[in-house]
Amino acid sequence: AQPVAGILDVLDNYAFVRTSGYLPGPHDVYVSMNMVRKNGMRRGDAVTGAVRVPKEGEQPNQRQKFNPLVRLDSINGGSVEDAKKRPEFGKLTPLYPNQRLRLETSTERLTTRVIDLIMPIGKGQRALIVSPPKAGKTTILQDIANAITRNNPECHLMVVLVDERPEEVTDMQRSVKGEVIASTFDRPPSDHTSVAELAIERAKRLVEQGKDVVG
């Protein structure tokens, strides 16, 4: 058996451990629905385990393109038993924001200071940046992201880029210290949808563990 780690993606009647990020890849690992139900696994879980690798000379199963998961070691960094007892996101209580995220960082960065003054952001708040093209939306997002990682290191930062240029993704990965999840414009629309959905599910699983997530 070979060790494996990734994000669980649950589809209609089967599941996969995405081993190369949030998008489907050739080295994904098949997980039976029986194993998912038995261990209380949920879509967006970060799992580790072992995969069965065909022996040398053994004919690969033509019907099963992906190697199956044969052992489950941990779910979201904890034991499988702990994962079974965790709360469900849908049953948690939504509250108005009551903890502020301070975005001011340095005297050179005026954008985040202006946001602090005009439209303060708190934990649990939704915000929208509306502007014409080439006005600097990406720069504002990078400034906000870097301010959160600096002033609120307890927050898990997720930056999801959908239908973006590949160079924009590289720029974001280099300038932001959080988790950058991307589906570039050369990928099919179905990939954009699945990346966005899986990223939301991942955020929910982190919240169930009591973590603060900013996305």
How should these model regions be labeled?
Residues 8-13, 23-24, 41-45, 63-66, ...:
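Short flexible coil/turn linkers enriched for glycine and charged/polar residues
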Residues 27, 158, 178, 212-214:
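The start of beta-strands in P-loop NTPase/AAA+ ATPase cores
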